[in-house]
Every structure is written in structure tokens, then in C-alpha cells.
Design a protein with these regions (language model features):
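Conserved alpha-helix/loop element of class I SAM-dependent methyltransferases that forms part
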Residues: 24-43, 58
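A short acidic, Gly/Pro-enriched loop at the edge of an enzyme's catalytic core
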Residues: 102-114
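Class I SAM-dependent methyltransferase SAM/SAH-binding core
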Residues: 44-103
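C-terminal alpha-helical "lid/dimerization" subdomain adjacent to the S-adenosyl-L-methionine
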Residues: 4, 10-23, 142-178
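Short glycine-dipeptide loop
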Residues: 42, 137-142
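A short SAM/SAH-binding and catalytic strip from SAM-dependent methyltransferases
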Residues: 112-126
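A generic alpha-to-beta junction signature in SAM-dependent methyltransferases
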Residues: 37-39, 62-63, 137
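A short glycine-rich, Lys/Arg-flanked "PGG" loop and its adjoining helix->strand segment in the class I
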Residues: 127-139
Length: 178
């Protein structure tokens, strides 16, 4: 496996390094995106493709009386996210699970908000994943997709040649799927 393939599904030592790097490297983008997410103190939030758990930690601060769940299909990511959020996990206001966004175990209409930071690029069945998110999201809830790349530059497309299974969607494409 090439090192950058660990952005899609982190495994082994390279994956552990990658999730730590993503926790740092995506910080500015996440801070920017979270400014647009309005949450009540007691909100229930799901972070899809939660990676190393840095955004779960931020979400917990935004809804201190709520509950934050994370899901990722990489065991390496789940382990790191649990470690980063061990305090919240230990007091039962957070849980991080291994799973597939296209087929989630969560109850219907349970989440006030669902987030996806730098992850929809790697979802093989985007339409099914969005249907599942719609199912678990409460009526009137918010789905925040926060991507650095939107396919508007050649720089964006270079990553699809480096990382297998990566698709960069233009804004209009994502809106069509939604």
C-alpha cells in the first residue's frame, strides 16, 4: 500500500501516522467549517469518516450536554479517535464505532447534525451513504460536508491520481446527490 492510500483507509504504522497528521493538517479547515454549524448545548451529533477524532473533540465542546458519535471504517482511525476522546468516552457522552456510512446501525431520526470532514471523496456509494445520513438525521437537522478540494483546479485532481478510490466532487455534483 502506498503511504497516501492511508488517507482513504488508514492501516498499520503508516495509517497511524496518517491519522495523526490529518488531525493536525485538517484543523484550519475544520475550524472554518464548524463556524457554520449551529448546535444546541444538548445536540446529538454524528461525525462520519471521523478519522483520528480531532473533530469529535471539537464537536463535544460545541454541545457539552449532548452526545457525539463517530463512525469510520478503519480500525486504526477508530482506535485513534477513541484515544483522543477517551475522557468523553469514559463518561459516556461519546462513542466511536467501526462501520460503513452506507449501512449504519444508528436509529432513524436521532441526530441533530451529521458532519463529514474531508471524507466523502472516499465513499464508494455516495448516493447510498447520503440516503443513510438522511435516515439518521432528524427532520430539520443539518448535514455539514466540509471539503478542501472541490475539483475546480488541476491541483485538486492530482490527488485522484495519487490516491486510489478517491473522487473529488464539484459543488454542483454534491448538491445533485443531496
Amino acid at each position: 500500500m502506498a503511504f497516501f492510500d492511508n488517507t482513504r483507509k488508514p492501516t498499520g504504522l503508516g495509517g497511524r501516522i496518517m491519522v495523526s497528521m490529518m488531525n493536525i493538517g485538517h484543523r484550519s479547515l475544520a475550524d472554518w467549517g464548524l463556524k457554520y454549524l449551529k448546535l444546541n448545548n444538548d445536540a446529538n451529533v454524528l461525525d462520519c469518516g471521523c478519522g483520528g477524532g480531532a473533530n469529535i473533540k471539537k464537536l463535544l465542546k460545541l454541545c457539552p450536554n449532548g452526545f457525539v458519535k463517530g463512525i469510520d471504517y478503519s480500525p486504526v482511525s477508530v482506535a485513534k479517535a477513541n484515544k483522543v476522546n477517551r475522557g468523553a468516552v469514559s463518561i459516556h457522552c461519546c462513542v466511536v464505532l467501526q462501520g460503513n456510512v452506507a449501512d449504519m446501525i444508528f436509529a432513524s431520526e436521532w441526530f441533530d447534525a451529521v458532519t463529514a470532514f474531508e471524507t466523502v471523496y472516499f465513499w464508494p456509494n455516495l448516493l447510498q451513504s447520503f440516503k443513510e445520513i438522511y435516515r439518521v438525521l432528524k427532520s430539520g437537522g443539518t448535514f455539514l460536508i466540509c471539503n478542501e478540494s472541490n475539483g475546480d483546479t488541476d491541483k485538486d485532481e492530482k490527488w485522484t491520481k495519487i490516491i486510489g478510490g478517491m473522487t473529488i466532487y464539484k459543488d454542483a455534483e454534491l448538491k445533485t446527490y443531496l
